[in-house]
């Protein structure tokens, strides 16, 4: 299955331990560990939920993925948006992407925990609320849903970015979710 992955630094493969913020080696990144799938990685450091699907529509038309995997929202929360506003923005984005004719798997990011980048209890609470908002949104939009908070994804010292073991756990969880999507798509 051809899979378009739209996400932030955790999709890109950002390694916060590196001095210049480089990527993990390909063998570590979850996008490179999805066996049996052709993966188009559109992860970008710092990406928040786009206001429209516009930047991805031509890519969807030209590459014809079977499924778009979307995991965004953490940067919105880090920039001060709440879970409700983030989910509303995601709703608009998903409407555009789905109108292009691609099926979508919406993934709730792992909830944040207190650490170097996460100093606020409110931020932690909003990341938990986002999981429920995305679950409801996926039901309303008729797209697939997965909660990465259920996959045992280990985060590094900043409590935002995946560790190498976190990438492996995410790949395992996503592989299972993709099998379920394939079964339903037919």
Predicted regions and their residues:
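Serine-esterase "nucleophile elbow" of acetyl-processing enzymes
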Residues: 1-43, 57-64
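Glycine-centered flexibility sites
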Residues: 7, 13, 43-46, 73, ...
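General structural signal for secondary-structure boundaries
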Residues: 33, 47-48, 82, 100
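Structural motif
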Residues: 46-55
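Alpha-helical cap/lid subdomain in secreted, periplasmic
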Residues: 54-186
């Amino acid at each position: 299955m051809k899979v378009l992955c739209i996400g932030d630094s955790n999709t890109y493969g950002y390694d916060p331990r590196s001095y210049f913020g480089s990527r993990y080696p390909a063998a570590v990144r979850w996008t490179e560990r999805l066996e049996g799938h052709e993966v188009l990685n559109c992860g970008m450091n710092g990406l928040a939920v786009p206001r429209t699907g516009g930047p991805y529509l031509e890519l969807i038309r030209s590459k014809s993925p079977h499924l778009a995997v979307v995991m965004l929202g953490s940067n919105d929360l880090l920039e001060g948006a709440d879970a409700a506003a983030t989910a509303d923005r995601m709703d608009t984005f998903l409407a555009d992407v789905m109108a292009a004719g691609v099926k979508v798997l919406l993934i709730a990011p792992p909830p944040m925990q207190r650490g170097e980048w996460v100093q606020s209890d409110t931020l932690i609470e909003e990341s938990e609320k986002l999981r429920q908002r995305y679950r409801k949104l996926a039901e309303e939009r008729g797209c697939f849903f997965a909660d990465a908070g259920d996959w045992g994804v280990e985060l590094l010292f900043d409590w935002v970015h995946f560790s190498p073991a976190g990438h492996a756990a995410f790949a395992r969880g996503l592989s299972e979710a993709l099998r379920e999507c394939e079964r339903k798509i037919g």
